[in-house]
């Protein structure tokens, strides 16, 4: 199991060989100082994981997260910690996990005004075809919010997907928007 260190809202894998291993198993994390490596061999620095990625990898048994006191944070504790740091973590994590289990590569979508950028092949190999916004199925979305989501996805030439999470059934439904000129 790969050793990872919790540092605030990030998790670091200091060992470069272990970083390469984790990255090569699904494009997890970002190598510090290297943008969009095309090959795992390009990983020559420690890997930085988001909390969402870390919770997922801990659940899968691929990483062991250790806090500043040397305590190992198992999946449940790491999930609880992340919930305190990230707004709507439960909704975001449910969507992240669902997309990963469906075989997609899921990265942060913050620069696109979304929760996630989703790839079919991987970063550095293609541009992300989708941006995903995670929403509680019971949450109301105003027409103005919907239009603002659409503007960002349209200007970046990505398909907008709303991921609707039903907390009761823990299911996720997806709605993809296609914008047309009239």
UniProtKB/Swiss-Prot annotation:
Transmembrane segments: none annotated. GO terms for cellular component: cytoplasm. Keywords: Lyase, tRNA processing. GO terms for biological process: tRNA splicing, via endonucleolytic cleavage and ligation. InterPro entries: tRNA_endonuc-like_dom_sf (IPR011856), tRNA_intron_Endo_cat-like_sf (IPR036167), tRNA_intron_Endonuc_cat-like (IPR006677), tRNA_intron_Endonuc_N (IPR006678), tRNA_intron_Endonuc_N_sf (IPR036740), tRNA_splic (IPR006676), tRNA_splic_arch_short (IPR016442). The active site is at residues 119, 127, 158. Its EC number is 4.6.1.16. Pfam families: tRNA_int_endo, tRNA_int_endo_N. It comes from the Archaea. GO terms for molecular function: lyase activity; nucleic acid binding; tRNA-intron endonuclease activity. Gene3D superfamilies: 3.40.1350.10, tRNA intron endonuclease, N-terminal domain. It catalyses: pretRNA = a 3'-half-tRNA molecule with a 5'-OH end + a 5'-half-tRNA molecule with a 2',3'-cyclic phosphate end + an intron with a 2',3'-cyclic phosphate and a 5'-hydroxyl terminus. Endonuclease that removes tRNA introns. Cleaves pre-tRNA at the 5'- and 3'-splice sites to release the intron. The products are an intron and two tRNA half-molecules bearing 2',3' cyclic phosphate and 5'-OH termini. Recognizes a pseudosymmetric substrate in which 2 bulged loops of 3 bases are separated by a stem of 4 bp. Belongs to the tRNA-intron endonuclease family. Archaeal short subfamily. Homotetramer; although the tetramer contains four active sites, only two participate in the cleavage. Therefore, it should be considered as a dimer of dimers. PANTHER family: TRNA-SPLICING ENDONUCLEASE SUBUNIT SEN2. NCBIfam families: endA. This is tRNA-splicing endonuclease. It comes from Saccharolobus islandicus (strain L.S.2.15 / Lassen #1).
């Amino acid at each position: 199991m790969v050793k990872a260190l919790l540092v605030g809202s990030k998790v670091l894998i200091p060992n470069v060989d272990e970083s390469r291993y984790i990255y090569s198993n699904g494009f997890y994390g970002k190598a510090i100082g290297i943008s969009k490596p095309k090959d795992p061999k390009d990983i020559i620095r420690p890997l930085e994981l988001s909390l969402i990625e870390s919770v997922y990898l801990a659940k899968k048994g691929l990483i062991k997260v250790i806090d500043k006191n040397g305590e190992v944070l198992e999946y449940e504790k790491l999930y609880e910690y992340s919930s305190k740091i990230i707004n709507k973590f439960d909704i975001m994590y449910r969507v992240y996990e669902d997309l990963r289990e469906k075989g997609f590569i899921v990265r942060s979508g913050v620069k696109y005004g979304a929760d996630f950028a989703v790839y079919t092949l991987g970063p550095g190999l293609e541009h992300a075809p989708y941006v995903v916004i995670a929403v509680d199925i019971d949450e109301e979305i105003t027409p103005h919010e919907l239009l603002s989501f659409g503007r960002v996805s349209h200007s970046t030439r990505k398909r907008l997907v709303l991921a609707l999470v039903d907390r009761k059934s823990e299911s996720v439904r997806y709605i993809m928007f296609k914008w047309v000129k009239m």
